[in-house]
Amino acid sequence: MKNRLLKGLALAVTMSFAAGLTLVPAQAASEIVIWADETRGPNLTKVFAKKSDWVPGSTIKVVSFSSYDALKDALDKASGTTGPDIFVAGNDWVPALAKSGKLAPVVLTAAQRAQFSPSQFFDLSYGGKLYGVPVDVNNVGMVYNTKLVKTAPKSYGDMVKFYLANKTKLGLKAGLCVAGGGMSWGGLSGFSALGAEPYQMNADGTVNFTKSFDATAFAKNVKTYLLDKNGKSNGFYPATDTGCQDNYLAGKVPFAIIGNWHWRTFAEAGFPMNIQPVPGVKAGTYGKMFGSVSGAFLTSYAEAHGVAVPAKSLLTNFFASTKGQVAYQAEEGRPPAEKGAQKSQLVLGGQKAMGAAASKSSIPQIGAFLNTNAGGANYWDSAPAYWTAVLVDGKDPLVEAKKLAAIWKANVAAGKADL
């Protein structure tokens, strides 16, 4: 998801925890204040405690919120001088915060821009202006338990066949479940592998604003792979993420979608990081995950606090640099966005595997489409609602798929103006 006096070479790095809005008092003119969530904040604090001179003459204060939602709530409520100079979060908040005037544009040199892919800047831009620097790739990936499954599945059907053949003998709780990111964000791969995505991307990386997914084909795949002969869930793919991580670690689920922020939990439990995208219905194809970047964003409050220049320097010297991203991701554990950091031998195998999975099959996370209710519901609510309707309530998958396609198509049409 400001104190600024450098006395000698000592950097004061502080943390405060907030569940809601944190009122930030006027600060010394050399202090840069960063807001982040409950995981990024503590990790940033560790990094700045080890190295203090990213911006000579400035101190850094990290304010950590109790959750990602709490960070968002605080940013929404911030006004006057109560906001941060920089915050770290996902890219889907950009349109609303840019329109509200809470973000400030960032200008990078050609050399700095060359260290990132163009699509990453798309994620952090609005109205033709860049508002942050890419920090890390934000994605999920699928792993499989090699004590149960000896080889990587080539298709969605391979996974379903294994589950149906072994669920009783092995006491399986599910076949594929979502352990990271929830049923909407983390669960996009579950939709996409069967043929449904909230927006369609053209081959050149642009958005197809007029086309939605094929509801008939998607519903057919749902019937084939997720329902039994009576139209009830066959148990392969649960409608909820509850218990997924524990069940996978206990050997009761052969395939799981995990997040790039907690892959080490599985690695430390002895599971190999055979990370890949969820295989599609056709062998050799893969379901798409959200593969956007999280960013470090410059706010308009930095100018009000008199620290716009050092805050911009922190963005480039730390957040957008090879050394900075390597140092940060040593604590955070996500795949770095910067090209030099991606190649570093200090970046762990699990991080690189997550990054490779995102490169193989992902779509950008476009908040203008995902956050709007123009179609009757936003993506975040409508996605899990589909699985509840079909897998729990027993509703017709085609009827519900047509509703979903219409909702998502309307949301894309409405969100076009916010790109």
Task: State where each predicted segment sits.
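Conserved N-terminal structural module of periplasmic/extracytoplasmic solute-binding proteins
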Residues: R4, G8, T14-M15, A19-L21, ...
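Short helices/loops that flank or line small-molecule/ion binding pockets
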Residues: L71-G83, K99-S100, K161-K169, T242-A256, ...
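A structural signal for short loop-to-beta-strand junctions that line the ligand-binding cleft
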Residues: K77, P84-D85, R113-K147, G284-M289, ...
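Hinge/lid segment of periplasmic solute-binding proteins
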Residues: N91-N139, T151, Y156-V160, Q276
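Extracytoplasmic/periplasmic solute-binding protein
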Residues: Y131-V135, V140, M159-T210, V253
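Glycine-centered hinge/linker elements that transmit conformational signals in sensory
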Residues: T206-P238
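Extracytoplasmic/periplasmic substrate-recognition and gating elements
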Residues: A267-G333
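Long, aromatic- and glycine/proline-rich binding clefts that accommodate carbohydrate-like moieties
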Residues: Q276, Q329-D381, W387-A389, G415-L419
